[in-house]
Amino acid sequence: MFNYFRKELDLGGRTLVLETGKIARQADGAVLARLGDTIVLCTAVGAKSAKAGQDFFPLTVNYQEKAFAAGKIPGGFFKREGRPSEHETLVSRLIDRPIRPLFPEGFYNEVQVIATVLSHDMENDPDIVALIGCSAALTLSGIPFFGPVAASRVGLVNGAFVLNPTLEQRAESKLDLVVAGTAEGVLMVESEAEELSEDQMLAAVEFGHKGFQPVIDAIIALAEHAARDPWTLPEQNPEHVALKQRLNEAGRTLLGNAYQEKVKQLRQEKISAAKKQIIETLGIGGTPEESIAKSMLKDLEADIVRNAILDTGIRIDGRDTRTVRPIIGEVGILPRAHGSALFTRGETQALCVATLGTGQDEQVVDALTGEYRSHFMLHYNFPPYSVGEAGRMGSPGRREIGHGKLAWRAVHPVLPAKDAFPYTLRVVSEITESNGSSSMATVCGSSLALMDAGVPLKRPVAGIAMGLIKEDRAFAVLSDILGDEDHLGDMDFKVAGTEQGVTSLQMDIKITSITTEIMRIALQQARDGRMHILGEMAKAITGARGSVAATAPRITVINVPKEKIREVIGTGGKVIREIVEFSGAKIDIEDDGTIKIASTSEESTQKAIDRIQGIVAEPEVGKIYNGKVVKTADFGAFVNFLGSRDGLVHISELQQGRVNKTSDVINVGDVVKVKVLGFDDRGKVKLSMRLVDQTTGEDISDKVGPKGGRGGRGEGDLAE
């Protein structure tokens, strides 16, 4: 019944298994990928024909994690998986990026790739398994695909690279790098690092590329037994070949002249006018050929721009290949924000705002591996006005989530330790203008905003986007690329870091692969650009401000014995709620006895501290405390002191001399001063008012005689 095939190989000391022919047999390609007990079902399906008028490749990649994979039931009212989480979106992009360049040019059939996590062993991350499985599914499907690709994760533990580290090893690693590519070269890199050198980053990429070579061999071996017949691509229409030639003759000069304009919006207007004139000149307006011609004009644009750069070394806006656009950094531009910055680089601009919060503001993430809390968030927004358009507004899309995470990875390694700076941090980046490299503008602006907010970063962080123009005859690496250079080029290579080293690196290749030599040149050129940008940023602010903004909460940390936590919280949280209501401060209590008190008012903070210390402090014999009478009886009065602690003032200790009734001296609600005499055999506190001057709070033990009894006078009054 099943036409089943299986391939096993060793991957970093663990067994990777690829199976096909048993599950999802109606998909064009289906592979069950397994590493340890982590299992991902990967499928690929393609439409047999393109939609009429389609002029782009509609590839969709969906990565989804099922709660049952970790033995869980989803939360929420409906108790089923809902919209993709941020993590699922990021992994979907991780799979999409290395496979997209490997479909043939002009292939416009819809293709859908789905990766479903069926089992998670809490040791092997499913993302690499999913990417490998999706590559295998496409290779088996018969869909035109110039693969296979494979991927590996590289860690750096105790100074040595580790291939596909476990979740436990990743927690100790100074590097989290994912590299994907073909047997010949690298297609995609994504990483977070603790200020590593460019040489270390390049060595990690090479280590990862070498590490996944057996996976490519295994996919090819599996395809030899189980691949479907390859699809037959339609031959190029001779009429289209002729149309392309006519467009080249009629449009090369017009488009070339339009690209001489240095200002983005004016250039776009001239390009649009040139295209319209070309269509009119050829007399194909309103015909089926018009849509085909518009698609071909994109290729002509790319050819004009790319060859101009290779021939002259001069780019669209007049720069050479290494020059960074003019930079202006400003901080403190929003008066009520905790920290703010406006970072402008040419025609790209980011308004970044930092907000400081408490532990109650941490993001709670319910992941397959368990619930955890994140105290640093970075949100990237790309409104349509940033490119002069009217468009959709709503929840963030995949691109915004991906760019935000890239900037997060760049800044995260330089944040202070949580115990040294116990704030929850949120940075929002509003892209107010865009002409390329907005994610790297976010990195720079976020660094400035955090320093403006008083966050003691280890060092400022800057980012730069590199591009590549590569033809058989030559190549050029471009620093600080424009939007058009990103669109028409062969590489988007983003590097962020400090003056000490790289904190994040992301590379996407639009051609089949690039060489180590090109990567080395790009990394060195990026370092030069990064140093220049850091110098420009230093003109705005060189380090964190000495204190947080007046509008930000001040967090004071105190520690109490672990066994006292229950007393501070109270039954059902009653005591802590009363303290919060009384003081107006926010209070976070951790299991180890650390208590964080946050308020914009010092008075509010001190009120909370006094209450808490009163609860946890132990009464000291001989010490005088302020108290309040909470109950009276024939034999004395109960006084509340040290927060919620009560003690007994015996009637003989109320005052010097004879006392007939307790109420003759004090009543409920009276504020008094008491001295701790000791503890009875049940641990109850014995107090005295008689030995304390109730006006000054002075200890007068040496000035009074023996205590008096009930119904009689004492042996002495105040000593003369």
Swiss-Prot record:
Catalytic activity line of the entry: RNA(n+1) + phosphate = RNA(n) + a ribonucleoside 5'-diphosphate
Domain KH stretches: 553-612
Compartment(s) of residence: Cytoplasm
Key word Oxidoreductase present: no
Entry cofactors: Mg(2+)
UniProt superkingdom: Bacteria
Tagged with keyword Disulfide bond: no
SMART domains: KH (SM00322), S1 (SM00316)
CDD domains, per database record: KH-I_PNPase, RNase_PH_PNPase_1, RNase_PH_PNPase_2, S1_PNPase
Similarity-based family: Belongs to the polyribonucleotide nucleotidyltransferase family.
UniProt source species: Granulibacter bethesdensis (strain ATCC BAA-1260 / CGDNIH1)
GO cellular component entries: cytosol
PROSITE patterns xrefs: KH_TYPE_1, S1
Protein's job: Involved in mRNA degradation. Catalyzes the phosphorolysis of single-stranded polyribonucleotides processively in the 3'- to 5'-direction.
UniProt xrefs under InterPro entries: ExoRNase_PH_dom1, ExoRNase_PH_dom2, ExoRNase_PH_dom2_sf, KH_dom, KH_dom_type_1, KH_dom_type_1_sf, NA-bd_OB-fold, PNPase
GO molecular function, one term: polyribonucleotide nucleotidyltransferase activity
Top EC class, one word: transferase
One Pfam family of this chain: KH_1
Record-annotated S1 motif domain positions: 622-690
Keyword terms: Cytoplasm, Magnesium, Metal-binding, Nucleotidyltransferase, RNA-binding, Transferase
PANTHER family: POLYRIBONUCLEOTIDE NUCLEOTIDYLTRANSFERASE, POLYRIBONUCLEOTIDE NUCLEOTIDYLTRANSFERASE 1, MITOCHONDRIAL
Segments of this protein annotated with the region Disordered: 698-720
Full protein name: Polyribonucleotide nucleotidyltransferase
Entry binding sites for Mg(2+): 486, 492
